[in-house]
């Protein structure tokens, strides 16, 4: 398995230590029951990560939708990043991208039969989706990017980890890209290593499994991206930072 080059700014370790102390204390307040986690009667699946940047969250959320919508009425709740609206918004036929944000809008276009909602307050959003007058028949809710939102206690926590930036090799913000210490992975029921190369070997998988150091109650999976049929397009890149899966597929 080829080594992954992870840029860590060691000069920022003191700041990362302060940040990590704050995150550790916040998590402990939840663990001790001082901050309350709320359970709901409806099944809730959380999909998220503990690093900033893309880990393939959208395609994995869409996979869950395809898997579940055959038998259940699915609702997806997102924060609605960069939207112009406030509070709870349930997407409908006339909902614009400005009202719910780019990714929720695209998801609703792709899966018109699901409930697609946004709300910064996840507990309030779940309450609305459980209201039979607002979203009748909701049977399962998928929380988008909610691994750190501990006010909700999901029935299943799915943690996504980028193959090219394993959490066991990363550091806390701002020295690295981790939102919380690595032991935060203990809250996950399922851990998925995403963006694996298609030619990854069984030996590589065994090495990765050992590096992840998961608990017996956790399940580990590996996924790769499969791109669809190519279509002619014109791309203009105004700002380039680091290669995304899209950039690598275009190159």
Model-identified regions with their sequence ranges:
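A transmembrane-helix-recognition feature enriched in membrane-embedded lipid enzymes
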Residues: 1-40
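Short beta-strand/turn micro-motifs composed of small residues
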Residues: 48, 78, 161, 195, ...
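Hydrophobic anchor at the start of a short beta-strand
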Residues: 73-74, 157, 220
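Phosphate/Mg2+-binding loops and adjacent switch elements
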Residues: 81, 86-110, 114-212
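Short, surface-exposed amphipathic charged segments that create phosphate/polyanion-binding patches used
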Residues: 131, 233-239
């Amino acid at each position: 398995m080829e080594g992954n080059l992870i840029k860590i700014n060691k000069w920022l370790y003191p700041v990362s230590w302060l940040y990590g102390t704050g995150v550790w204390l916040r998590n402990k307040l939840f663990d001790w029951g001082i901050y309350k986690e709320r359970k709901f009667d409806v099944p809730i699946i959380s999909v998220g990560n503990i690093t900033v940047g893309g880990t393939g969250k959208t395609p994995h959320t869409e996979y869950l939708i395809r898997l579940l919508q055959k038998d259940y009425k699915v609702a997806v709740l997102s924060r609605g990043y960069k939207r112009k609206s406030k509070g709870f918004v349930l997407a409908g036929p006339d909902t614009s991208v400005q009202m719910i944000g780019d990714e929720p809008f695209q998801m609703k276009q792709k899966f018109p039969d699901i409930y697609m909602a946004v709300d910064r307050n996840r507990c309030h959003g779940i309450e609305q989706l459980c209201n039979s007058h607002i979203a009748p028949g909701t049977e399962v809710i998928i929380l988008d990017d909610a691994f750190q939102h501990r006010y909700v206690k999901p029935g299943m926590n799915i943690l996504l980890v980028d193959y090219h930036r394993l959490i066991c090799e990363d550091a806390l913000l701002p020295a690295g890209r981790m939102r919380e210490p690595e032991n935060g992975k203990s809250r996950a029921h399922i851990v998925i290593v995403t963006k694996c190369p298609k030619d990854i070997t069984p030996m590589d998988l065994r090495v990765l499994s050992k590096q992840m150091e998961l608990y017996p109650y956790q399940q580990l999976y590996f996924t790769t991206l499969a791109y669809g049929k190519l279509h002619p397009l014109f791309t203009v890149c105004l700002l380039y930072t680091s290669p995304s899966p899209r950039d690598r597929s275009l190159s």
